[in-house]
């Protein structure tokens, strides 16, 4: 099967320099959703027709299994498909999709393709309470589809029809090429309508079949920021519904955003206003506190993420406790039962089991052993203005509060660093290392007294 995706529209109502099909829905471009669905149908050829912002669209797709055709002038959907004809295989049917209709399910498209087979024309239609703006499906007395009439070209009788065209169709490729060559633009829009091939098929006696989506939202397109926002909410509601059906506890299903792929184990609990981006995995029994932002991360079984944490490209070990207000940056790997507390930032570091940094610390470019305690205010000074260096803290070390470790430096096994230490040389294992000014008490010292000004 050939698949052609139309993605050349100007998108004037979006009021944006970004091509319409590149606007994000659930964290990825509208067109990316359509291409993902198209790939699931295993097409032999996949062609995207581009126009406005075509170079940016090509750059976004950047995949060897997708080829492109260009529609320099926006002269209608029929004209757009014409631009792709020389890339299509005549021996298999062609399915036409739209880059701004992102949520059509593969199951629905398979039903349409199955109904049409190799020799029939198939149209995806839907019944709408308010069909305003859509092309109407015209059937004869026997129920056969005879034509599709666009809103601006419809008479009063046709405007009363509630079955509408979604624009998605499949038909034999050789016939499609013949019909497109006969299209005319003598209509209110002055465009070449792809839907006119329906009338051509009917006049030749070719059977026209139809299929219907399970839900209206599968056929909704995006022409404005308002419609994009509405479709985002619909999509997020559907994703939340699936999580609930899979056994995830959502404290408020209307207050979660998934902008990628979220995989959850058993007995996962997610509080309000959490955002998941990229590929996120939550193990069994994980609890996510309110207002967390988690991107491309794995949270292992039994871990708890307290409110207002930001986690990106990190791994959180089983039974660990993170936050509140903690930040795990790319390259962070935490083993089991690690505690990262409030206002602690960890970057490109590995922290072994049972270690803790509970308050106000920065751990960057570090390797931390097991059972290490990192005191409040501790900083690994990893950057000299030109290069970054690593800090190594071995098992059972105790780092006192307000300590600076100037990398590259090593803290030996079981070593203790006194509070306020600035460590510039390795600290030997099992020893107390302190680097700070000696405390002095000045006997008889008095605070200065403010002098009185003369009147």
Curated annotation (Swiss-Prot):
Residues 1-225 are annotated as: Pyrophosphorylase. This is Bifunctional protein GlmU. It comes from Ralstonia nicotianae (strain ATCC BAA-1114 / GMI1000) (Ralstonia solanacearum). Residues 226-246 are annotated as: Linker. Pfam families: Hexapep (PF00132), NTP_transf_3 (PF12804). One of its GO terms (cellular component) is cytoplasm. Catalyzes the last two sequential reactions in the de novo biosynthetic pathway for UDP-N-acetylglucosamine (UDP-GlcNAc). The C-terminal domain catalyzes the transfer of acetyl group from acetyl coenzyme A to glucosamine-1-phosphate (GlcN-1-P) to produce N-acetylglucosamine-1-phosphate (GlcNAc-1-P), which is converted into UDP-GlcNAc by the transfer of uridine 5-monophosphate (from uridine 5-triphosphate), a reaction catalyzed by the N-terminal domain. GO terms for molecular function: glucosamine-1-phosphate N-acetyltransferase activity; magnesium ion binding; UDP-N-acetylglucosamine diphosphorylase activity. Acetyl-CoA binds at residues 376, 382-383, 401, 419, 436. The active site is at residue 359. UDP-N-acetyl-alpha-D-glucosamine binds at residues 6-9, 20, 71, 76-77, 98-100, 135, 150, 165, 223, 329, 347, 362, 373. One of its GO terms (biological process) is cell wall organization. Its EC number is 2.7.7.23, 2.3.1.157. InterPro entries: Bifunctional_GlmU, GlmU-like, GlmU_C_LbH, Hexapep, MobA-like_NTP_Trfase, Nucleotide-diphossugar_trans, Trimer_LpxA-like_sf. Residues 247-455 are annotated as: N-acetyltransferase. It is found in: Cytoplasm. Gene3D superfamilies: Hexapeptide repeat proteins (2.160.10.10), Spore Coat Polysaccharide Biosynthesis Protein SpsA, Chain A (3.90.550.10). It comes from the Bacteria. Pathway: Nucleotide-sugar biosynthesis; UDP-N-acetyl-alpha-D-glucosamine biosynthesis; N-acetyl-alpha-D-glucosamine 1-phosphate from alpha-D-glucosamine 6-phosphate (route II): step 2/2; Nucleotide-sugar biosynthesis; UDP-N-acetyl-alpha-D-glucosamine biosynthesis; UDP-N-acetyl-alpha-D-glucosamine from N-acetyl-alpha-D-glucosamine 1-phosphate: step 1/1; Bacterial outer membrane biogenesis; LPS lipid A biosynthesis. Binds 1 Mg(2+) ion per subunit. The keyword Nuclease does not apply. Its cofactor is Mg(2+). Mg(2+) binds at residues 100, 223.
